[in-house]
Amino acid sequence: MTPLVGNKAIEGAAIAWVMELERAAGRDPRDTRHKGAPADIESPPRVIEVKAFGTTTRGYDLPLEVRQMDEAKRNPNFYLYVVEHVKQGDPDEFTLRVLGGERLQRLLERAKEYRGYYVPWPVADYDAGALGLDQ
């Protein structure tokens, strides 16, 4: 299997895999990533935010956007699906950890707010830049 490169590829593979799992569980998942929804997938009755990681998340914090945190606190059907070991590219090797209900609520009580920025870096600009210290 070819390893996946980049966050978008890892996230896309994880979301596709979760949607397959949801269908196998008899639910009807819909990808809501580009629809302004607070989570990646609506799979009634569940609202699912997929957190995709190239390797394990053991010992790491899970980032949530403010709107995801608000939805998680408000909606008892909000779930975090943590998909690990995605980078290697073989769905048979992916692992899933599901956080929902009281367990998720207990974790949310300990959440720490952070503030940060993501700076868009278009491919054209990336490709046009010099390598190394010769900037």
Regions found by a protein language model. Give the residues of each.
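Acidic-basic catalytic patches of nuclease active cores, encompassing PD-(D/E)XK
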Residues: M1-R30
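Residue-identity detector for glycine
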Residues: G6, G12, G26, G36, ...
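Conserved catalytic cores of phosphodiester-cleaving nucleases, focusing on short active-site segments
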Residues: E22, I41-G54
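Intrinsic-disorder/low-complexity coil detector
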Residues: D28, L62, V119-W121
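Domain-level recognition of nuclease-like catalytic cores that cleave nucleotide substrates
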Residues: V83-Q135
